[in-house]
Structures are given as C-alpha cells and as structure tokens.
Amino acid sequence: MAAKEIRFSDDARQRMMSGVNQLANAVKVTLGPRGRNAVLEKSFGAPTVTKDGVSVAKEIELEDHFENMGAQMLKEVSSQTSDVAGDGTTTATVLAQAILREGMKSLAAGMSPMELKKGIEKATEAASNYLSDELSKPCEDDNSIAQVGTISANSDEAVGRIIADAMGKVGKEGVITVEEGSGLDNELDVVEGMQFDRGYLSPYFVTDQQTMKAELEDAAILLHDKKISNIRDLLPLLEGVAKQNRPLLIIAEEVEGEALATLVVNNLRGIVKVAAVKAPGFGDRRKAMLQDIAILTGGTVISDEVGMTLENATVDDLGTAKKVQISKEETTIVGGAGRHDDIMARVEQIRAQMEESTSDYDKEKLQERVAKLVGGVAVIKVGAATEVEMKEKKARVEDALHATRAAVEEGIVPGGGTALIRALAALEGLSGANEEQTQGIALVRRAMEEPLRQLVLNAGEDASVVVNKVREGTGNHGYNVATGEYGDLVQAGVLDPTKVTRSALQNAASVAALMLTTEAMVADLPKKDDEGGGGDMGGMGGMGGMGGMM
C-alpha cells in the first residue's frame, strides 16, 4: 500500500477551497444568456466549445491531490443537481462556492463548524419551502413550456418551441429522445401508438411495394409467447378471421417452417391478409411487453402459464387495432381497442415498479413502456453545420428537455436569479439556537445573491447595483440579463423550473456543509522520480566482455 499524506483542519480546508475555486471559476463564466464560452481540449480532433457547466466541470482534474478532492466534491454538486432536475448545474456550483467562501471566513473567526452546519441546513430548508410553497406557479400551457426550454437552451427559441411541440404531441408521460440529425435544421418525428423494433418475418407480407411496408386496417392481433411451427394449431383462428374478412397480425416468439410458409401462401393468394412479427424484448421483459400489447389492444396473451393453448384459442382472444404498420425493422400499432381503465391500471402498475427500481436503465425502459401505452414517442433530431456545433447543441437540447420536464412536474419560478432573491424573505427574522447557527443562516443569505451577481457580471454590468434594485422589487419583478431591462420576468418569459432552483440550493448547501466540517484529508504521496533511476544500467557496460564467449 502506498504511503499517504495527511492534512488537518484549516490547512486541509484551504487546499480544498483552492480546488473548489479553480473548478467554480471555470464553470461560472458560462452562466446565463450572456455567459462566455469555455473551450475544452480533446485528445484527438477539434476542441469542444461549450456553454454547458457540467461539460466544463467533467473535464477538470487537478494535479494536487488535496485540491483535486475539493474540485471532485464540487463536481458532485453539479452532477447530483443534473441527475435530479437535469439543469441548474452552474447555479448549484456558484451557490456551493459562495456558501463555502463565506463559511471559511466564519471558521477563521473561530466559530464551530458543526453549529454553522446546523444554521446552513435551517436556512436551506426555509428557503426551499418558500420557493415551492410561495413562489412556484404551475407550468401547464405550451407557451410556458417553450419559455422554460428557451432559457435552459441558452436563449435558443427554436429549441424551446420544438420541445413544447413534442410535449404537446406525446403528452407529459410521453418519451422524448434527442438524436443527431442529418440536416441543418432541428426536426421533430412523432410516433403515435405502440412501436417496437421488430419487423416482418417475410417480405412476402408487404402490402405497399413502394415503401416496402405491410399495412393492416382494423386488424385482429394474435399474441403468443411460444414458437409457432405447426399450421394446424393456427387453422381455427385463421378460419375465424377469414370469415370476418379482417387482416391478422401474429406476434409470437417465432413463426417458422410450415406455419410461416402456409401464411405466406395464403397471403399471396388473397385468402387471408396476414403478417407475422417476432415478439419484442427478451425474457421477462418480453412477457411484460406482450401483456402491454394485450391490454392496449383488448386481447389476451395465449400462454401455457394461464392454461391457454393455441389450438383452443378463439377469435374473442384476439386484440384489435385500427391500424398496424410493419416495416423491415419496426412495427407500429395505432388505435388499440383496449379499455381505458385497464390501460391506466397497467400504467399505475408500471409506475409502481419504477418507484422500486434502483437501476437507471430499468427505469428508462419502464418509462418507455408507460409512454407507449398512454402517449407516444417523439424524437428531436438536432441539426447543425459542423460536428463541434452538433455536440454542443445536442447537450443544450438535452438540458432544456430535462428542465421542461422538471417545470411540468413542480412548477416554475421567476428566472435570472430572482427567485433566490425573493426567497430571502423566508430568512428574514430567522435565527438559530445560538450566535454561530445564526451566522450559518446569514452566510446562506449572502450566498443566495451570488447567482444573480454572477449573471450580471457575465453580462458586464455592475452586480451590486442590480442586486439592490431587484431586492427593492416584489414578486416576479427582476432583471432580464438578456435585454438589460427590469420588469416582470414571468411575462418576459424568463423562467426557471422550481425543481431546478430548489435542487441547486439544497445540493450546494449539503456539499458546502460537508466541506466546512472536514477536519482531515488523506491522499497518496506524490510519486517521486527515483534519483538517477537510469544509473543502475551502467553495470551493463561489463557485457562488452561477453565477446570472449564466442
């Protein structure tokens, strides 16, 4: 085990603070509509130009181990805020640095870090409650959603508008994904209904030769969790569907051999219009998705587990959909005939699974299933002229998407750092059990001005003048950094999601309090180069004598 270096109390905290300052100073220049760019070197290819705080923070590793620990702890603030709310990372970094800076002054004056921590926690709780209960307004209309997206995407109105369109089309439960597009403009693709990535098992099922798609109107849908290889099992169902003159979609683990050949022949002769696809997913997820399709279409999964066999199945066990579209790669079911109550019960069941799940991957897949049942899936294709611009723009669109989700969830507050200034009202008259706790409350009060100060500094204005003017106002009155004017920020469309502002404050206070109560730091000793490390090879000169061995 390598030898360690240990630093204690003030020495440890000062080194940590140095690392915090280096990271925070690099990140905070990107804050706001008039924030500056940061340029990140890449090991190959062109450097990345970004105004995204998290991207800058992720790149920073410091040489000094103790400074690096401070920087990494501050990084945790932005990544936690990003995980919970999807945005507000730069604000959280600015707040944490400010709380820590003010706290270090109090520690230098001989105050107890534990009492300061209690004061910080008390102030944070009061301010967070004020944000959620007093300031927050619901965000429901398209206009508010577009404004939140615009602000989060660094004042890019096109991004805000496309996110609002996507949410309008797939609903608040719908899944919206961001991909790299092929053109210069942003595009929105919306898939309504249930889509899964399995295509037709034979090109002979195609009904439209130009698009190479199979389209079935008012289709009956057979769901089976086993392989189908014997056509005799299917005959009763095929006859029943043919009598009703309806097309049939078969979704099974596999359709092969004689069964597939017979279906193709029947389809080509026009006896019964049919198409077959493999069931989506694998293992337990496949069973769950088949059940989702059954509930969506009002059908039943033919499965041994519930004592049903294919030869005993009737037309009543089949699901129904207004339209089914099948391409080589995917199948889309639109207008399933399932009962609304059954679908909503299934959605609640999946949501309960999401609450219990600890895996982000599982949660994402469960959320996709909810979207396919109730909303749909929208894909925003980001357009840009160059690879560098594409990456930067995609990161901004993803940020904006997270922010709008947070706004829909918990509501909105006036943006531009104004919400935190208004939340200072919650700290008026608030005092701790002793003087040191009261000082903890005071340093949070000072730190809550910092995001507005930084926004104004980045815009090249006088921060103190603006902060005082904003404090004199009430409600949504604040400073619009983009235009340089004072006014009602909600009307001007300068909004922040409540969840983002609240999470930024809570995470910043949590990590700053942790750092202030740090009393010892342990790190690996810097590796020393062995002096004269190459000198040992000198002895090899004697090998010249080996010539005598010939």
Curated annotation (Swiss-Prot):
GO annotation, cellular component aspect: cytoplasm
Biological source species: Halorhodospira halophila (strain DSM 244 / SL1)
Gly residues compositional bias, start-end: 534-550
Keyword Nucleotide-binding: yes
Alphabetic keyword roster: ATP-binding, Chaperone, Cytoplasm, Isomerase, Nucleotide-binding
Binding site for ATP: 30-33, 51, 87-91, 416, 480-482, 496
Gene Ontology terms, MF aspect: ATP binding; ATP-dependent protein folding chaperone; isomerase activity; unfolded protein binding
Source domain of life: Bacteria
Matching NCBIfam families: GroEL (TIGR02348), PRK00013.1 (NF000592), PRK12849.1 (NF009487), PRK12850.1 (NF009488), PRK12851.1 (NF009489)
Protein name: Chaperonin GroEL
Disordered as annotated region, ranges: 525-550
